[in-house]
Amino acid sequence: MPKIYLSPSTQESNPYITGSGSEEYNMNRLADALEPYLYANGIRFVRNTPDMTAASSIAQANRLGGFDFYLALHSNAAAPDNSGSVRGVLVFYYPTSAEGKRAAELFAANLKRVYPLPDLVRTVPTTALGEGRQPK
C-alpha cells in the first residue's frame, strides 16, 4: 500500500480574509477530513504537526524516508489589491516525474468534482517548491 507524508500548512499567522481562521487552521481541517479516507483505503501516512514549519516538515519526511508521495496542503495569498478576488486550485508536480504528474491529475480531477469553480482547478509543473528527496 502507498505511504504518504501529509503536510498541512503551519502558517498560523496567515489569516483568511473571510475571517474563517488562518491558513494553518483551514488546511489542518482539510487534513483532518482526509484522514478517514486514507485509513479506509489502507493508505499509510505520517502527518506533520502545527508546531512544525515547512522546512522542518520536509526535513522530517526526508529523515523518515520511504514515502511514495508528499502531500502539502496550502492556500495562496494574494497581493492587497487582489485580496479576496483570486480563486482556484493549483496542484503542483515535478515536471520530469510521470508518476507525479499522474498523481496531480488524479487530485485535480477529484478536486474539480467538489470545488465550486471547477474550471479554476489545474495542474502546474514546478521545480520551485521546498526540496524533498525523491520518494523511494
Residue ranges, per PLM feature:
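Active-site-proximal helix/loop segments of hydrolytic enzymes
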Residues: 2-4, 12-14, 25-136
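Flexible glycine-/small-residue-rich
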Residues: 8
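Periplasmic OmpA-like peptidoglycan-binding domain that tethers envelope proteins to the cell wall
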Residues: 19-23
